[in-house]
Amino acid sequence: MISPLFFASEGGFGLNLDLFDANIVNLAIVIFGLYKFLPPFIGGILERRRVAIMADLQDSEDRLLKATEALAAAKKDLAAAHQKAEQIREDCKLRAEAIRLDSEKRTVEEMARVKQGATADLNAEASRASAQLRREAARMAIENALSALPGKLNTEAQSKLVSQSIKNLGEA
């Protein structure tokens, strides 16, 4: 086998064929390079990511705040709308009650007017009928008296009775 130090023994640049030693040296170089150069690079990436996440969080918080304010305003508007609807409902009930009472009042007044008119018509008809019956009764009484009297009265008494009967008929 070839000695690992063979190639390096001449001086200058040589190959180290001992894999374990070579890997440790390579790992040390890589770890040193990562330690020296990677933190600023990864730190920059992580910082940009942190800034983006913070901006997203701030945006989310702003949207949450706006949504909460909008929800509160909507609830306030809803409560105001419910209150206005209740007020309108109460106003409608009061107006309907006023209209109903007014209608009842007008109906009662109309019924009273019709009743008064009917009573007045009935009284007028009763008065007319009563006057007609009195006239008819007086006429019949005069006719009966006139037919019975010619044999009982003389001409002068008969003429006086007819004049008085005509006078009574004129007053009635």
UniProtKB/Swiss-Prot annotation:
Q: Which Pfam families match?
A: ATP-synt_B
- Location within or outside the cell: Cellular thylakoid membrane
Principal cellular location given in the protein's record? membrane
- InterPro entries annotated for this entry? ATP_synth_b/b'su_bac/chlpt
Keyword Transport annotated: yes
The UniProt transmembrane annotation reads: 27-47
- Asked if the keyword Cell membrane belongs to this entry, the reply reads no
User: Which keywords has UniProt assigned to this entry?
Assistant: ATP synthesis, CF(0), Hydrogen ion transport, Ion transport, Membrane, Thylakoid, Transmembrane, Transmembrane helix, Transport
One GO MF term attached to the UniProt entry: proton-transporting ATP synthase activity, rotational mechanism
Q: What cellular component GO annotations does this protein have?
A: plasma membrane-derived thylakoid membrane; proton-transporting ATP synthase complex
Membrane topology per record: Single-pass membrane protein
Instruction: Please state which protein family the record places this protein in.
Output: Belongs to the ATPase B chain family.
State whether it acts alone or in a complex, and with which partners, per the record: F-type ATPases have 2 components, F(1) - the catalytic core - and F(0) - the membrane proton channel. F(1) has five subunits: alpha(3), beta(3), gamma(1), delta(1), epsilon(1). F(0) has four main subunits: a(1), b(1), b'(1) and c(10-14). The alpha and beta chains form an alternating ring which encloses part of the gamma chain. F(1) is attached to F(0) by a central stalk formed by the gamma and epsilon chains, while a peripheral stalk is formed by the delta, b and b' chains.
Function as written in the Swiss-Prot or TrEMBL entry:
F(1)F(0) ATP synthase produces ATP from ADP in the presence of a proton or sodium gradient. F-type ATPases consist of two structural domains, F(1) containing the extramembraneous catalytic core and F(0) containing the membrane proton channel, linked together by a central stalk and a peripheral stalk. During catalysis, ATP synthesis in the catalytic domain of F(1) is coupled via a rotary mechanism of the central stalk subunits to proton translocation. Component of the F(0) channel, it forms part of the peripheral stalk, linking F(1) to F(0).
PANTHER family assigned:
ATP SYNTHASE SUBUNIT B, CHLOROPLASTIC
Q: Which NCBIfam families match?
A: PRK07352.1
Record's protein name: ATP synthase subunit b
Organism, per UniProt?
Answer: Prochlorococcus marinus (strain MIT 9313)
